[in-house]
Amino acid sequence: MATQKKPDLSDPQLRAKLAKGMGHNYYGEPAWPNDLLYVFPIVIMGSFAAIVALAVLDPAMTGEPANPFATPLEILPEWYLYPVFQILRSLPNKLLGVLAMGSVPVGLILVPFIENVNKFQNPFRRPVATTVFLVGTLVTVWLGIGAALPLDKSLTLGLF
């Protein structure tokens, strides 16, 4: 990786170029023809080859035909809904479960406002936001694992 020279704004030639509209894109390697003719086609062909390879090497599995009159004992949602499914399953009152599920997006919306006075980007210099993130991640993983377990072995919140 090469270091780029910072422009000298007191240079009259550079000021003349900036006045003509040649801004920060003037420095470095131009996009035409380098990126558009060489890099983009390689990325597009590589992505297409990966998709075709995945489609050929791992085709979609066709299972047994669906029977609308036979319902499985436990119906599980998709994997990304396991934590909120476990919240619903572990709380006895369904209204309380729905309110707890609604608190998940509200909590995610409030995360940026927890420590907005701290302008540092380093996580070690933002202990409150880092702690909230780590605790939230651990609770989400714990709830997701609990939802994947059978109903009789399911995790509880320790309250009921």
Swiss-Prot record:
Pfam families in alphabetical order: Cytochrom_B_C
Entry keyword set: Electron transport, Membrane, Photosynthesis, Thylakoid, Transmembrane, Transmembrane helix, Transport
Single Gene Ontology MF annotation: electron transporter, transferring electrons within cytochrome b6/f complex of photosystem II activity
Membrane-spanning segments: 36-56, 95-115, 131-151
Assembly notes: The 4 large subunits of the cytochrome b6-f complex are cytochrome b6, subunit IV (17 kDa polypeptide, PetD), cytochrome f and the Rieske protein, while the 4 small subunits are PetG, PetL, PetM and PetN. The complex functions as a dimer.
PANTHER family: CYTOCHROME B
Biological function: Component of the cytochrome b6-f complex, which mediates electron transfer between photosystem II (PSII) and photosystem I (PSI), cyclic electron flow around PSI, and state transitions.
Name by which UniProt lists this protein: Cytochrome b6-f complex subunit 4
Species per Swiss-Prot/TrEMBL record: Nostoc punctiforme (strain ATCC 29133 / PCC 73102)
